[in-house]
From Swiss-Prot:
It is found in: Cytoplasm. GO terms for biological process: proteolysis involved in protein catabolic process. PANTHER family: ATP-DEPENDENT PROTEASE SUBUNIT HSLV (PTHR32194:SF0), METALLOPROTEASE TLDD (PTHR32194). It comes from Staphylococcus saprophyticus subsp. saprophyticus (strain ATCC 15305 / DSM 20229 / NCIMB 8711 / NCTC 7292 / S-41). CDD domains: protease_HslV. HAMAP family: HslV (MF_00248). This is ATP-dependent protease subunit HslV. It comes from the Bacteria.
Length: 180
């Protein structure tokens, strides 16, 4: 049995001038054991002006949160600059390259995915998801954004994660939504 500890499924959306990020609460040990059902995978950073969520190794994610928050401070809350600088450091540092996690970071105007291979990705349609249930959440989110425009960003984030939790065994329905 694998002893790696993973946490999965984050979804972020900007809709009608509002931004929301949702994460489920499940932390899995290896492939078979649920260690925790109420983890908080979405955090507020930089005076509550930035949201960050992680999928992947829990310990690695905490390292990345800390490094990203340092970059935000260094670049006065400039989300894009902080994300690019983190990605460059992550890609260029031999020890950091070993980290197994991805981040979604967002403020009121931007959503970015930051990966350990140095990518900083801006989604085309103002929504993105990562983690084992990410594809399910992304599909649900796109359908909601196209066909349920009356929903708030927060409702879209919650419902997208709910769909993922119904399909993905590594995603539960203990959903936490943060809004900007």
């Amino acid at each position: 049995m694998s002893t790696s500890i993973h946490a999965t499924t984050i979804f972020a959306v900007q809709h009608n001038g509002h931004a929301a990020m949702a994460g489920d609460g499940q932390v899995t040990l290896g492939e078979q054991v649920i260690m925790k059902q109420t983890a908080r995978k979405v955090r507020r950073l930089y005076n509550d002006k930035v949201l960050a969520g992680f999928a992947g190794s829990v310990a690695d994610a905490f390292t990345l949160f800390e490094k990203f928050e340092t970059k935000l401070q260094q670049f006065s809350g400039n989300l894009e600059r902080a994300a690019v600088e983190l990605a460059q450091e992550w890609r260029g540092d031999k020890q950091l390259r070993q980290l197994e996690a991805m981040l979604i970071v967002m403020d009121e105007t931007s959503i970015l995915v930051v990966s350990g291979t140095g990518e900083v990705i801006v989604p085309d349609d103002n929504l993105i998801a990562i983690g084992s249930g990410g594809n399910y959440a992304l599909s649900a989110g796109r359908a909601l954004k196209r066909n349920a425009t009356h929903l708030s960003a927060s409702e879209m984030a919650y419902e997208s994660l709910k769909v993922a939790s119904d399909i993905c065994v590594f995603t539960n329905d203990r959903i936490i939504v943060e809004n900007l």
